[in-house]
């Protein structure tokens, strides 16, 4: 830090509120999402936005009986700092053909829509696809067709694949 500049805060530090999600809760939420999607389908393929969309896409595809799964790899976070969007891997030609080039009959799945930047980019690639997320924040929610839980914009979701169980000493031993 030079010349009295404030340190750059991570997205997590700016968010302030924590929303930890266990594996059990995440699986229940994905199944609830599937119940809603079952009324919308059928779908020819599931497109997972990686990496966060991989786990929910696997659960949703299994529950809906969809065998074709593809990914679109977009990097926007470096650990916990959001940066410029970078398409690392586009949607396969085979999946694009299944969706008629516009995404019709395709299901895009992600864990969360936050600011909507990633969602907007994928929507441009597949404008007629159905976009589903497990969680949604207000800024990104308008881009999503189906979601399960809305959280405030200032909430940081701790997904089970990003966390680990750890020992905490009892309060009487000075734990906060």
UniProtKB/Swiss-Prot annotation:
Record-annotated membrane-spanning stretches: none
Listed cofactors: Mg(2+)
EC numbers, comma separated: 2.4.2.-, 2.4.2.22
Residues reported to bind xanthine: 114, 157
Keyword Cell membrane recorded: yes
Entries under Gene3D superfamilies matching the protein: 3.40.50.2020
Catalyzed chemical reaction(s): GMP + diphosphate = guanine + 5-phospho-alpha-D-ribose 1-diphosphate; XMP + diphosphate = xanthine + 5-phospho-alpha-D-ribose 1-diphosphate; IMP + diphosphate = hypoxanthine + 5-phospho-alpha-D-ribose 1-diphosphate
Binding site for GMP: 114-118, 156-157
PROSITE patterns in UniProt: PUR_PYR_PR_TRANSFER (PS00103)
GO biological process: GMP salvage; purine ribonucleoside salvage; XMP salvage
Primary enzyme class: transferase
Major site of localization recorded for this protein: membrane
Binding site for Mg(2+): 111
Pfam families membership: Pribosyltran
Topology relative to the membrane: Peripheral membrane protein
Similarity comment text for this entry: Belongs to the purine/pyrimidine phosphoribosyltransferase family. XGPT subfamily.
Subunit details: Homotetramer.
Function per UniProt: Purine salvage pathway enzyme that catalyzes the transfer of the ribosyl-5-phosphate group from 5-phospho-alpha-D-ribose 1-diphosphate (PRPP) to the N9 position of the 6-oxopurines guanine and xanthine to form the corresponding ribonucleotides GMP (guanosine 5'-monophosphate) and XMP (xanthosine 5'-monophosphate), with the release of PPi. To a lesser extent, also acts on hypoxanthine.
HAMAP family attached to this UniProt entry: XGPRT
Official protein name in the record: Xanthine-guanine phosphoribosyltransferase
Organism, as annotated: Bradyrhizobium diazoefficiens (strain JCM 10833 / BCRC 13528 / IAM 13628 / NBRC 14792 / USDA 110)
């Amino acid at each position: 830090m030079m010349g009295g500049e404030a340190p750059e805060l991570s997205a997590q530090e700016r968010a302030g509120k924590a929303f930890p999600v266990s594996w059990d809760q995440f699986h229940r939420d994905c199944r609830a999402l599937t119940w809603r999607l079952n009324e919308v389908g059928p779908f020819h393929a599931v497109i997972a936005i990686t990496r966060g969309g991989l786990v929910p896409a696997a659960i949703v595809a299994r529950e809906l009986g969809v065998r074709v799964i593809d990914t679109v790899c977009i990097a926007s976070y470096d650990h916990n700092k959001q940066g410029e969007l970078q398409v690392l891997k586009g949607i396969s030609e085979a999946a694009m053909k299944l969706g008629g080039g516009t995404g019709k009959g395709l299901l895009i799945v992600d864990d969360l829509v936050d600011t909507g930047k990633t969602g907007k980019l994928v929507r441009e690639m597949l404008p007629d696809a159905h976009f589903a997320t497990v969680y949604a924040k207000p800024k990104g929610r308008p881009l999503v067709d189906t979601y399960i839980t809305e959280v405030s914009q200032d909430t940081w979701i701790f997904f089970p694949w990003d966390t680990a169980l750890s020992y905490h000493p009892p309060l009487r031993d000075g734990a906060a």
